[in-house]
């Protein structure tokens, strides 16, 4: 297994954060998917089906956070491009319940991508690895790919974090931007960042860190994570 649900970490000495086009690295896609499903099952979600179609979609890019030897997967996220081979995950999840979702998406000033598939193993819960570092890297990647806008379907927890990156509730969709998502048995928040290049309304520190990655996609940075200093090896490729 490439994830650990029993041994929470207080500190990791080093991690790797890299990106790739899904169709170019099936092995890493499988590790990403295995870890994500393992976490969902650990929290009691009943999985009657799952799709692997995104692995074969040229419009999907993956951010994976892992050990530097690639033996342990800690978390990650995906970017899926609107208008590629697949409908977006948000369309599959709530499209039947939000009748004007497709109209809203097609009215965007593309290219538009969905930030989705965000997860982290329980082993690194509380360290921000699967949330802050994953979102930061995905937004940096989106800018390098030339995307203009991003949307994201957020849980209550990720919605609170999303404000740091300039995502705002789309009040014209659902119930003022919220919809009860039976798959997670909670309300989901439909959010939108209209300018990921300039990161409108984002936190100044996060904007600086994202632009630093964009300017230096292959980068090593030492940061305090948890109880100690972690060496972060970025390799953000398009």
Feature locations, PLM:
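Short, solvent-exposed polar/charged micro-motifs at secondary-structure junctions
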Residues: 27, 60-61, 162, 181-183, ...
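C-terminal/domain-terminus segments
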Residues: 8-38, 129-145, 209-221
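A conserved beta-strand-loop-helix scaffold within acyl/acetyltransferase catalytic domains
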Residues: 12-110, 234-238
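Short, surface-exposed beta-strand/loop "edge" segments at domain boundaries and coil↔beta transitions
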Residues: 71-73, 159-160, 197-200
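Acyl-donor-binding surface of acyltransferase catalytic domains
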Residues: 1-9
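Accessory, usually C-terminal, subdomains that scaffold auxiliary metal cofactors
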Residues: 168-230
């Amino acid at each position: 297994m490439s994830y650990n649900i029993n041994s929470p970490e207080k500190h990791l000495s080093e991690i790797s954060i890299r990106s790739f086009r899904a169709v170019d690295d099936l092995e890493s896609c499988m590790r990403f998917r295995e870890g994500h499903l393992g976490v969902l099952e650990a929290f009691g979600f009943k999985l009657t089906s799952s799709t692997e179609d995104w692995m074969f979609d040229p419009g999907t890019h993956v951010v994976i956070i892992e050990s530097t030897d690639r033996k342990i997967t800690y978390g990650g996220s995906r970017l899926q491009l609107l208008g590629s081979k697949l409908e977006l995950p948000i369309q599959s999840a709530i499209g039947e319940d939000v009748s004007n979702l497709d109209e809203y998406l097609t009215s965007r000033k593309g290219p538009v991508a969905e930030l989705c598939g965000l997860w982290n193993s329980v082993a690194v819960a509380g360290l921000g690895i699967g949330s802050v570092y994953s979102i930061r890297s995905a937004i940096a990647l989106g800018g390098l790919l030339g995307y203009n806008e991003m949307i994201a379907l957020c849980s209550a927890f990720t919605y609170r974090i999303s404000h740091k990156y300039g995502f705002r509730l789309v009040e014209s969709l659902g119930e003022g931007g919220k919809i009860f998502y039976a798959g997670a048995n909670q309300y989901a928040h439909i959010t939108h960042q209209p300018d990921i290049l300039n990161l409108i309304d984002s936190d100044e520190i996060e904007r600086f860190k994202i632009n630093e990655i964009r300017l230096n996609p292959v980068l090593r940075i030492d940061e305090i994570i948890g109880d100690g200093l972690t060496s972060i090896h970025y390799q953000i490729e398009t």
